[in-house]
Swiss-Prot record:
Annotated protein name in UniProt: ATP-dependent Clp protease proteolytic subunit
Alphabetized InterPro entries for the sequence: ClpP, ClpP/crotonase-like_dom_sf, ClpP/TepA, ClpP_His_AS, ClpP_Ser_AS
Lineage: Eukaryota, Viridiplantae, Streptophyta, Embryophyta, Tracheophyta
Pfam families given in the database record: CLP_protease
Single GO BP term: protein quality control for misfolded or incompletely synthesized proteins
Its EC number(s): 3.4.21.92
């Protein structure tokens, strides 16, 4: 049996015969996007490209971003967040499984009132971490300064989009804070919890 991405039939408007396309391309046509892995430059660029293309194609139809991600790199995650704010269509964010670290940052970036978590989803927030533990002292100081700026940026976004006071978000980001779907709703990261 072949292994790979499943194919599904798709008929373009005005065509008689359907062609077989991979399931993700079919879902993209319905404006359904998926972040189902660690956030890195590759997936970030793919999602940014899709959001820009789909918003040019039709700026009146909303986009739906499904998230099941353990987090990942800060800059590619912030790039996804910024694109979500930039495109004209509203971007709904849907947490299924886990939205941790940058995954939760992207989740909170959905259009306010259009952020959803599945009932058994988990959300985790924390401060950004450095990957340069073995850097020279001078490099480490520069890295620490940049890390503090990024932490401040992420904290401000959480404060703005959750309505929580700055001191609460700052304190919570000091460590890994895991939340259930209903706890994430109470915190303001999502607006709705899907019913079972």
């Amino acid at each position: 049996m072949p292994i790979g991405v499943p194919k599904v039939p798709f008929r373009s408007p005005g065509e008689e015969d359907a062609s077989w396309v991979d399931v993700y391309n079919r879902l993209y046509r319905e404006r359904l996007l998926f972040l189902g892995q660690e956030v890195d430059s590759e997936i970030s660029n793919q999602l940014i490209g899709l959001m820009v293309y789909l918003s040019i194609e039709d700026e009146t139809k909303d986009l739906y971003l499904f998230i099941n991600s353990p987090g990942g790199w800060v800059i590619p995650g912030v790039a996804i967040y910024d694109t979500m704010q930039f495109v004209r269509p509203d971007v709904h964010t849907i947490c299924m499984g886990l939205a941790a670290s940058m995954g939760s940052f992207i989740l909170v970036g959905g259009e306010i009132t259009k952020r959803l978590a599945f009932p058994h989803a988990r959300v985790m927030i924390h401060q950004p971490a450095s990957s340069f533990y073995e850097a020279q002292t001078g490099e480490f100081v520069l890295e620490a300064e940049e890390l503090l700026k990024l932490r401040e940026t992420l904290t401000r976004v959480y404060v703005q989009r959750t309505g929580k006071p700055l001191w609460v978000v700052s304190e919570d980001m000091e460590r890994d804070v895991f939340m259930s779907a209903t706890e994430a709703q109470a915190y303001g990261i999502v607006d709705l919890v899907a019913v079972e």
